[in-house]
Amino acid sequence: MSQVYSRKVNSACAKPAQEWRIPMEEKKWWKEAVVYQIYPHSFMDSNGDGVGDLRGIKSRLSYLKLLGIDVIWLSPVYQSPNDDNGYDISDYRDIMTEFGTLEDFDEMLAEAHKLGIKIVMDLVVNHSSDEHRWFVESRKSKDNPYRDYYIWREAKDGKEPNNWGSCFGGSAWEYDQTTDMYYLHMF
């Protein structure tokens, strides 16, 4: 159940959000903040290419603040081949080109902080894209230093190691001819 924090109970509904809400610094923000998730691809397009972007998000921060938003939960914006809506990250240190640049991100973050809005990044660390440099390296040989970053198994009776299924259907195991082994891909 959500809670409404009001300084003036009888007039709270008639006042703008910023006048009746307890300031963020008085809250345990991770428990009491109003969080708004943004899927950047469809949120706000700043350059007319039909794809939402970081500059588009920045342009709407004041409006989100007026709505009473304390925290933005930002869906993945990292570099990705985008086979899984950005959850297949190929570079954790860069922004997907269609969303902008690292400079655009820094500007959006600075503006959010200026307005007292926190940003929580959706950081996917339990899997990466098959185009991530670590995975590309792990495929090169069985003794590659990156090999243990991923789950590799020998074939069982000439087939997948087990009957596990991928979240999107089909086997969770993909055969890799280079080392004659299967790697696990749940997505």
Regions found by a protein language model. Give the residues of each.
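Acidic/aromatic-lined carbohydrate-recognition and catalytic surfaces
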Residues: 24-187
